[in-house]
Regions:
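A structural microfeature
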Residues: 135-137, 153
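Short, small/polar residue-rich loop motifs at catalytic or cofactor-binding pockets
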Residues: 40, 118-120, 138
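Hot-dog-fold acyl-thioester-processing enzymes
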Residues: 2-89, 144-201
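Generic short beta-strand
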Residues: 44, 123-125, 141
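A generic structural motif
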Residues: 96, 126-128, 144
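Conserved GNAT-family N-acetyltransferase fold
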Residues: 62, 123, 137
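Hydrophobic beta-strand-centered segment that forms part of the acyl-chain substrate-binding groove
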Residues: 69-119, 134, 201
Protein backbone atom coordinates (compact mmCIF):
# COMPACT_ATOMS: atom_id res chain seq x y z
CA UNK A 1 0.00 0.00 0.00
CA UNK A 2 1.30 3.47 -0.90
CA UNK A 3 0.24 6.47 1.15
CA UNK A 4 -0.24 9.87 -0.44
CA UNK A 5 0.32 13.34 0.95
CA UNK A 6 -2.79 14.88 2.46
CA UNK A 7 -3.57 18.33 1.00
CA UNK A 8 -4.24 19.58 4.53
CA UNK A 9 -0.93 18.29 5.90
CA UNK A 10 1.63 20.65 7.38
CA UNK A 11 4.46 21.39 4.93
CA UNK A 12 6.85 19.85 7.47
CA UNK A 13 6.99 18.42 10.97
CA UNK A 14 7.13 21.13 13.60
CA UNK A 15 8.85 21.02 16.97
CA UNK A 16 7.08 22.03 20.15
CA UNK A 17 9.87 24.58 20.74
CA UNK A 18 10.05 26.37 17.40
CA UNK A 19 9.98 30.13 17.82
CA UNK A 20 11.25 30.02 21.41
CA UNK A 21 14.60 31.64 22.11
CA UNK A 22 17.43 29.78 23.80
CA UNK A 23 18.21 30.60 27.40
CA UNK A 24 21.29 32.77 28.02
CA UNK A 25 23.96 30.75 29.81
CA UNK A 26 24.35 31.74 33.45
CA UNK A 27 27.43 30.04 35.01
CA UNK A 28 26.02 30.73 38.48
CA UNK A 29 22.70 28.98 37.81
CA UNK A 30 22.29 25.49 39.31
CA UNK A 31 22.12 22.56 36.86
CA UNK A 32 19.68 19.80 37.79
CA UNK A 33 20.49 16.10 37.34
CA UNK A 34 18.60 15.06 35.34
CA UNK A 35 17.19 18.12 33.60
CA UNK A 36 13.40 18.22 33.34
CA UNK A 37 12.61 20.44 30.35
CA UNK A 38 9.58 18.98 28.57
CA UNK A 39 6.04 17.88 29.46
CA UNK A 40 3.18 16.92 27.16
CA UNK A 41 -0.14 15.05 26.90
CA UNK A 42 -0.64 11.93 24.74
CA UNK A 43 -2.51 13.26 21.69
CA UNK A 44 -5.26 11.40 19.72
CA UNK A 45 -3.08 11.31 16.59
CA UNK A 46 -0.35 9.52 18.54
CA UNK A 47 -2.58 6.53 19.40
CA UNK A 48 -2.45 3.46 17.13
CA UNK A 49 -4.67 0.44 16.42
CA UNK A 50 -3.57 -1.17 19.71
CA UNK A 51 -5.15 1.68 21.65
CA UNK A 52 -1.91 3.08 23.03
CA UNK A 53 0.79 5.52 21.91
CA UNK A 54 2.46 4.24 18.76
CA UNK A 55 6.17 3.43 18.85
CA UNK A 56 7.04 6.17 16.34
CA UNK A 57 5.49 8.78 18.61
CA UNK A 58 7.81 7.87 21.47
CA UNK A 59 10.63 9.12 19.24
CA UNK A 60 8.58 12.22 18.44
CA UNK A 61 8.27 13.01 22.16
CA UNK A 62 11.95 12.26 22.82
CA UNK A 63 12.74 14.57 19.90
CA UNK A 64 10.80 17.38 21.58
CA UNK A 65 12.73 16.68 24.78
CA UNK A 66 15.96 16.97 22.77
CA UNK A 67 14.78 20.27 21.27
CA UNK A 68 14.08 21.60 24.75
CA UNK A 69 17.61 20.54 25.74
CA UNK A 70 19.12 22.25 22.68
CA UNK A 71 17.33 25.46 23.62
CA UNK A 72 18.62 25.08 27.19
CA UNK A 73 22.27 25.14 26.10
CA UNK A 74 21.99 27.68 23.29
CA UNK A 75 20.61 26.26 20.02
CA UNK A 76 17.39 27.82 18.73
CA UNK A 77 15.82 28.98 15.44
CA UNK A 78 18.29 31.86 15.05
CA UNK A 79 21.21 29.47 15.48
CA UNK A 80 19.83 27.16 12.80
CA UNK A 81 19.15 30.09 10.48
CA UNK A 82 22.86 30.90 10.79
CA UNK A 83 23.64 27.51 9.27
CA UNK A 84 24.28 24.96 12.02
CA UNK A 85 22.09 22.43 13.81
CA UNK A 86 22.16 19.07 15.58
CA UNK A 87 21.33 15.82 13.78
CA UNK A 88 20.55 12.40 15.24
CA UNK A 89 23.16 9.73 14.43
CA UNK A 90 21.82 6.83 16.50
CA UNK A 91 18.78 6.17 18.71
CA UNK A 92 17.84 3.32 21.06
CA UNK A 93 14.35 3.32 22.62
CA UNK A 94 13.17 0.97 25.38
CA UNK A 95 9.37 0.66 25.66
CA UNK A 96 8.63 -0.25 29.28
CA UNK A 97 4.93 0.54 29.81
CA UNK A 98 2.01 1.73 27.72
CA UNK A 99 1.18 5.42 27.36
CA UNK A 100 -2.54 5.95 26.80
CA UNK A 101 -4.64 8.72 25.27
CA UNK A 102 -4.73 11.86 27.40
CA UNK A 103 -2.08 10.73 29.88
CA UNK A 104 0.40 13.39 31.04
CA UNK A 105 4.07 12.75 30.26
CA UNK A 106 7.14 14.15 31.99
CA UNK A 107 10.53 13.95 30.28
CA UNK A 108 14.02 14.13 31.78
CA UNK A 109 17.38 14.24 30.02
CA UNK A 110 20.99 13.61 31.06
CA UNK A 111 24.16 14.41 29.15
CA UNK A 112 26.24 11.23 29.50
CA UNK A 113 29.21 12.19 27.33
CA UNK A 114 30.43 14.63 24.69
CA UNK A 115 33.35 15.56 22.49
CA UNK A 116 34.01 18.54 20.23
CA UNK A 117 31.04 17.74 17.95
CA UNK A 118 28.96 14.91 19.46
CA UNK A 119 26.58 14.43 22.39
CA UNK A 120 25.47 11.21 24.10
CA UNK A 121 22.15 11.87 25.84
CA UNK A 122 19.74 9.73 27.83
CA UNK A 123 16.03 10.59 28.02
CA UNK A 124 13.53 9.07 30.43
CA UNK A 125 9.75 9.28 29.93
CA UNK A 126 7.52 9.12 33.02
CA UNK A 127 3.81 9.29 33.71
CA UNK A 128 3.58 12.81 35.14
CA UNK A 129 1.03 11.82 37.81
CA UNK A 130 2.09 8.35 38.96
CA UNK A 131 5.80 8.75 38.28
CA UNK A 132 5.95 5.36 36.52
CA UNK A 133 8.76 5.09 33.99
CA UNK A 134 7.24 4.42 30.56
CA UNK A 135 10.26 4.47 28.25
CA UNK A 136 13.87 5.52 27.82
CA UNK A 137 15.51 7.02 24.75
CA UNK A 138 19.26 7.06 24.26
CA UNK A 139 20.73 9.17 21.45
CA UNK A 140 24.02 9.98 19.80
CA UNK A 141 23.72 13.49 18.34
CA UNK A 142 26.08 15.32 15.98
CA UNK A 143 26.60 19.05 15.53
CA UNK A 144 26.39 19.79 11.79
CA UNK A 145 27.32 22.65 9.48
CA UNK A 146 24.27 22.46 7.20
CA UNK A 147 25.91 24.43 4.39
CA UNK A 148 29.00 22.22 4.27
CA UNK A 149 26.87 19.09 4.90
CA UNK A 150 29.33 17.75 7.45
CA UNK A 151 29.89 17.59 11.19
CA UNK A 152 31.46 20.63 12.83
CA UNK A 153 32.84 21.52 16.28
CA UNK A 154 30.57 23.30 18.74
CA UNK A 155 31.24 27.03 19.14
CA UNK A 156 33.23 27.85 22.28
CA UNK A 157 30.31 29.48 24.11
CA UNK A 158 28.05 26.46 23.63
CA UNK A 159 30.86 24.05 24.47
CA UNK A 160 31.44 25.82 27.80
CA UNK A 161 27.78 25.38 28.72
CA UNK A 162 27.81 21.73 27.62
CA UNK A 163 30.97 21.07 29.66
CA UNK A 164 29.28 22.54 32.73
CA UNK A 165 26.19 20.36 32.21
CA UNK A 166 28.32 17.24 31.68
CA UNK A 167 30.44 17.93 34.77
CA UNK A 168 27.30 18.13 36.89
CA UNK A 169 25.57 15.13 35.31
CA UNK A 170 28.71 12.98 35.61
CA UNK A 171 28.43 13.18 39.41
CA UNK A 172 25.35 10.92 39.37
CA UNK A 173 25.61 7.12 38.99
CA UNK A 174 25.70 5.99 35.36
CA UNK A 175 22.34 5.06 33.82
CA UNK A 176 22.23 1.24 34.17
CA UNK A 177 20.71 0.67 30.72
CA UNK A 178 22.89 3.13 28.78
CA UNK A 179 25.02 1.67 26.02
CA UNK A 180 23.30 -1.71 25.86
CA UNK A 181 22.83 -3.54 22.58
CA UNK A 182 19.56 -5.15 21.47
CA UNK A 183 19.56 -8.92 22.01
CA UNK A 184 17.34 -11.81 23.09
CA UNK A 185 18.79 -12.64 26.48
CA UNK A 186 18.32 -16.24 27.54
CA UNK A 187 18.76 -17.68 31.00
CA UNK A 188 21.88 -19.79 31.38
CA UNK A 189 20.93 -23.30 32.65
CA UNK A 190 22.18 -23.92 36.16
CA UNK A 191 24.78 -26.69 36.54
CA UNK A 192 23.95 -29.06 39.39
CA UNK A 193 26.60 -29.86 41.99
CA UNK A 194 26.44 -33.57 41.09
CA UNK A 195 27.05 -32.85 37.40
CA UNK A 196 29.93 -30.54 38.15
CA UNK A 197 31.56 -33.15 40.42
CA UNK A 198 31.11 -35.92 37.84
CA UNK A 199 32.60 -33.81 35.05
CA UNK A 200 35.65 -32.89 37.11
CA UNK A 201 36.66 -36.55 37.70
Amino acid sequence: MTTTLSPAAEPRLRSAYEGQKSRPYDPAAPIATPLELHRCIVQPEWVDYNGHMSESCYLLVFGDSSDAFFRYFGIDDDYREAGCSIYSAETHIRHLREAMLGEPLRLTVRLLDLDDRRLHVFHSMHHATTGAQLATGEQLLTHVDMRAKRSAPFPDAIRRHLDAIHAEHARAPREPHAGRAIAIRRAVPAVSTASATSTSR
